[in-house]
Amino acid sequence: MRTHYCGQINAELAGQEVTLCGWVNKRRDLGGLIFIDLRDREGLLQVVFDPDQKALFETANSLRQEFCVRLSGKVNRRPESQVNKNMATGEVELLATDLEIFSRSEPLPIDFNQQVSEEARLRYRYLDLRRPQMNEKLQFRAKVTSAVRRFFDDNGFLDIETPMLTRATPEGARDYLVPSRTHKGRFFALPQSPQLFKQLLMMSGFDRYYQIVKCFRDEDLRADRQPEFTQIDIETSFMSAEQVMEITEQMARDLFKQLLDVDLGEFPSMTWHEAMRRFGSDKPDLRNPLELVDVADVLKDVEFKVFSGPANDEEGRVAAIRLPGQAENVSRKMIDEYTQFVGIYGAKGLAWIKVNDRSAGREGLQSPVLKFLPDEVIEPLLERMQAETGDVLFFGSDKSHVVAEALGALRLKLGKDFELVSNEWKPLWVVDFPMFEVADDGSLAALHHPFTAPVNVTPEELKANPAAAISNAYDMVLNGVELGGGSVRIHENAMQQAVFEVLGIEKDEAQEKFGFLLEALKYGTPPHAGLAFGLDRLVMLMVGASSIRDVIAFPKTTTAACVLTDAPGAANPAALQELGVKSIVKEDE
């Protein structure tokens, strides 16, 4: 139907006849001529219609925005005065000789020249995706997946599919359940990840596996979450954690170099404890220069219980952030707003000190908490914070996890508000995570998943002191975004049983849910390790989008609905009866 894409037309084709297909992006009449900008996935091209060709000109006169057409004509150089340097094809235009209208368009229900709500964009997604900026994002995504496949194919990995219909596993979120018609009363679950199947593939001898795979989680949504998302899934046998990190880091470096011409360099490594201590986050944005500094030892003997209480509590922490040179710009109103902000993360308040004159000691400071601080702690505190004239110090004092979350979030907000974040790429590995975390009910939960191997402990030692166990896990972080997470897996039956026991999973329950895995672990399981990247999140970061919905063709809303197709919808009663399922929700609920 066509010989070229619009975006391929350039001065080298001047004088040639070409045929193009696409949509009318814009139409204008000027000096007795009709001009249109023809658009396809590769770009725009100006087309001109000569009034001397009466039949063609009459047809062109009926063209309106978003008509879908085929055009043939001769490529001409534009006069120098008419060259449009804002268009990639701005040196040339097409003098039309033939026009076929494939289909006409009614007036568009949305005007993309104005601010359009996200719901409207999703409702008319097929129109939204015609916009060049959306088209470019999805084309970029396609380039990412192609580059990923090439990399793993070239490195001896096998692309193997795993089941979409499986059984529920405890991976931290609710499952999407699929009722079985042939096994009434029983349900499949859509996979939250291919975790267990890829481990079984290692046990089957496929020592290098990868898959670009859909995963499903029924959870509350945020800007970087979707109920269905795409994962770059990797698993290897006979490779150490360091080797897995090395090959996946190389993949990331190659990807950024090929597609963005960005050299990420070697990734530094940081322990989880260091990340939480310095940045209040296990996915720190290293572009932000602000850090959390511990000051509990300086303030542990003051009479002010807000500081001394947590400073003398084994589970407490007192830390501060130094905001350099902004004392004059930080108003009391801003401090009140920051106090409310940290309250979202559980902080009971936000103490602060302005350093108006570092050389004047106490007299050069401004703060409502100064009256509670004796002279002997002032200088050590300022030295610890490396405070200088014009700085503002913000304090967090509470349980360690509250201080980390509150000051970690404040660090990011201060970095954004005062434009401290550099415009560069800052990758790192976060390693040595705790094996377990304390759940809301006081029980232990796996920080990653229950198939992650601990570092250098026996099953007996793990059960005796699970809180001290370190997992052999690693997360790849870039600019504050977790690109991927992985770990060395448990490959011994006794250790897997021990982890289940620590997690409070009884033997009968473990057998019911994971009997196939425990059985497989009896028959010569190789040491294995892997990692999974969130493809949507990776592309979002690379193209600079604010939400993964901008890099998914047909995403769901924040309520996990598709406004385009009006899904989820009510099921046919006959289909429910055949499945042995009864709806207890009324139609209007």
UniProtKB/Swiss-Prot annotation:
L-aspartate binds at residues 171, 217, 448, 489. GO terms for biological process: aspartyl-tRNA aminoacylation. GO terms for molecular function: aspartate-tRNA ligase activity; ATP binding; nucleic acid binding. Gene3D superfamilies: Bira Bifunctional Protein, Domain 2, GAD-like domain, Nucleic acid-binding proteins. Keywords: Aminoacyl-tRNA synthetase, ATP-binding, Cytoplasm, Ligase, Nucleotide-binding, Protein biosynthesis. It catalyses: tRNA(Asp) + L-aspartate + ATP = L-aspartyl-tRNA(Asp) + AMP + diphosphate. ATP binds at residues 217-219, 226, 482, 534-537. It is found in: Cytoplasm. GO terms for cellular component: cytoplasm. Residues 195-198 are annotated as: Aspartate. It comes from the Bacteria. Its EC number is 6.1.1.12. Pfam families: GAD, tRNA-synt_2, tRNA_anti-codon. Its main location: cytoplasm. InterPro entries: Aa-tRNA-synt_II, aa-tRNA-synth_II, aa-tRNA-synth_II/BPL/LPL, Asp-tRNA-ligase_1, Asp-tRNA-ligase_1_N, Asp/Asn-tRNA-synth_IIb, AspRS_core, GAD-like_sf. Transmembrane segments: none annotated. The keyword Protein biosynthesis applies. It is an enzyme of class 6 (ligase). Homodimer. This is Aspartate--tRNA ligase. It comes from Idiomarina loihiensis (strain ATCC BAA-735 / DSM 15497 / L2-TR).
